[in-house]
Amino acid sequence: MLFSSSLSSSMRHRTLTSSPALWASIPCPRSELRLDLVLASGQSFRWREQSPAHWSGVLADQVWTLTQTEDQLYCTVYRGDKGQVGRPTLEELETLHKYFQLDVSLTQLYSHWASVDSHFQSVAQKFQGVRLLRQDPTECLFSFICSSNNNIARITGMVERLCQAFGPRLVQLDDVTYHGFPNLHALAGPEVETHLRKLGLGYRARYVCASAKAILEEQGGPAWLQQLRVASYEEAHKALCTLPGVGTKVADCICLMALDKPQAVPVDIHVWQIAHRDYGWQPKTSQTKGPSPLANKELGNFFRNLWGPYAGWAQAVLFSADLRQQNLSREPPAKRKKGSKKTEG
């Protein structure tokens, strides 16, 4: 089902200073969360920095703007019914708390990783506050199907177009219209693949449609994905790999970011290069010169043995640092010098 693009009168994106009465906060120091490092690092593809240090996006079928100070995480929620304008409720704050998994002490994890890994210790000094999001399994699955042979900017565009075409319209802020993520029935509908190809998803369009149909027709629906949260890591990974378009790396992304498997270590070319360059790692069970299912498992075990049960979280810190460094290297020297302080925690 395609959703209409007709727009009604819009609200504006809020900032903490423009409408302080509509914000609420959670105690959260920057050492536990850095929004700029977490929301733009390829975990979720639905957040934009609409004004300086204010990130707007969709979470749990609501539109939010987030910002932070040195010790508080602030949020505001835009509700479609203008009669419901007000500060975020306790339930909404709990949704945000769970999304960022704030029950997990990042400071303690960093301390442990630094104690067993001198390279991590040197990197972490400048990249405090990188933690894993706990995402909706359906959104995470189809977002990472779009990630195949892709980069963050292009994935973000694909996911946004998919939501605009097949997701429910939520609210318009300034000139930006926000949509919820499509459900499985919307993605399994007739002509979906053709439409997604027109939207630029290429061969991934077939995988999106086929995986949605497989979950609905062979696995019994979205509850199957939710149930993988209580399955073992190995069981969940194996189950995900039965879906069209899901290989070992995509399955590890979903396990780590949506299915409560903090030991999952997604291996792409970035992580492969980090392992070779910074750890001198070489595969023993495979002669491959790049990521492969067998080598990925071996490398994942290497990092799990090094970092422990939250190995996937530690990998995310190094991935974010490597990504930020690559982005800086592409900037013109003048801009790099001007913005260099922003890369340090």
From Swiss-Prot:
Listed EC numbers: 3.2.2.-, 4.2.99.18
- Keywords per UniProt: DNA damage, DNA repair, Glycosidase, Hydrolase, Lyase, Multifunctional enzyme, Nucleus
The set of disulfide-linked cysteines is none
Q: Where does DNA bind?
A: 149, 154, 204, 270, 287
Q: Which residues form the signal peptide?
A: none
Biological-process GO terms, alphabetical = base-excision repair; base-excision repair, AP site formation; cellular response to cadmium ion; cellular response to reactive oxygen species; DNA damage response; DNA repair; negative regulation of apoptotic process; negative regulation of double-strand break repair via single-strand annealing
Q: What is its main location?
A: nucleus
This one is known as N-glycosylase/DNA lyase
Q: Which organism is it from?
A: Rattus norvegicus
